[in-house]
């Protein structure tokens, strides 16, 4: 079973590390090409392209400039411990033990605009380059064209190594668009998380993101490998709703708190 999640805009390069083990990202040659493109942008251009403040644009111009491909624990950090958004609040990788990291390294992948695909222990240097950004590059008008089949091929390699051909899509739409489902050699399952609001169940972005992290942790902690095991997910008040679920879309609901 291969879990897919999105990266986060918020990064943490200060907290104590839960592990000293690390690996190197597998697509750094491609990342380097994107960095070369990004370095041609001025801070005001970055601000417009990403829709961010001047201060953040300056920070990211500096990050692009400082980025260099020889990753060490001194200049980079394991991806699963560097990302700090809502998904990662649910995941709580900082509390993983060695066996959890082992399982995650085999079964969890983070999609990334700059790095393509990251394994949990892959070192990464700080960046901001969302998959949906229209950064023109030698391969096309945006990052989807840049990555083409590369991300899908890398996921198929991981699936081949595991032998259980199931992908659990816990990534956002923006990021999953970088994957070619028809070329993915796996059964695709998408968990959906609905929260009750004024008597109706709907996707509430903040809760749904955290729930994706909770589900990822649930799979890792319990070493799940079969799709039917996912329906037991019951963290923080969620329950499986068989009636509205289908074989490839598992619906989990939670009553208003």
Swiss-Prot record:
GO aspect biological process, one term: response to hydroperoxide
Q: Which domain of life is it from?
A: Bacteria
Output a single Gene Ontology CC term carried by this record: cytosol
InterPro entries in UniProt: YaaA (IPR005583)
| Pfam families per UniProt | H2O2_YaaD
Q: Tell me which family the UniProt entry assigns to this protein.
A: Belongs to the UPF0246 family.
Q: What is the protein name given in its UniProt record? A: UPF0246 protein YaaA
Look up and give the organism this protein is from. Salmonella typhi
Q: Which gene encodes it?
A: yaaA
């Amino acid at each position: 079973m291969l879990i897919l999640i999105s990266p986060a805009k918020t990064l943490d390069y200060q907290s104590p590390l839960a592990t000293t083990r690390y690996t190197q990202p597998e697509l750094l040659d491609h990342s380097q090409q994107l960095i070369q493109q990004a370095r041609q942008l001025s801070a005001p251009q970055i601000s417009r392209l990403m829709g961010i403040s001047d201060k953040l644009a300056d920070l990211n111009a500096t990050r692009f400039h400082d980025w260099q491909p020889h990753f060490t624990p001194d200049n980079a950090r394991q991806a699963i411990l560097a990302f700090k958004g809502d998904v990662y609040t649910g995941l709580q990788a900082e509390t993983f033990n060695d066996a959890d990291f082992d399982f995650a390294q085999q079964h969890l992948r983070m999609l990334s605009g700059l790095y393509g695909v990251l394994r949990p222990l892959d070192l990464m240097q700080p960046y901001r380059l969302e998959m949906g950004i229209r950064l023109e590059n030698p391969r096309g008008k945006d990052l989807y064209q840049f990555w083409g089949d590369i991300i899908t091929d890398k996921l198929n390699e991981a699936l081949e190594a595991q032998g259980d051909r199931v992908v659990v899509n816990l990534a956002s739409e923006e990021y999953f668009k970088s994957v070619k489902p028809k070329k993915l050699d796996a059964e695709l399952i998408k968990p959906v998380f609905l929260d009750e609001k004024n008597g109706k169940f709907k996707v509430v972005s903040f809760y749904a993101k955290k729930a994706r992290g909770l589900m990822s942790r649930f799979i890792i902690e319990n070493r799940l490998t079969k799709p039917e095991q996912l329906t037991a997910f019951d963290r923080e008040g969620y329950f499986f709703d068989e009636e509205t679920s289908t074989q490839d879309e598992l619906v989990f609901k939670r009553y208003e708190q």
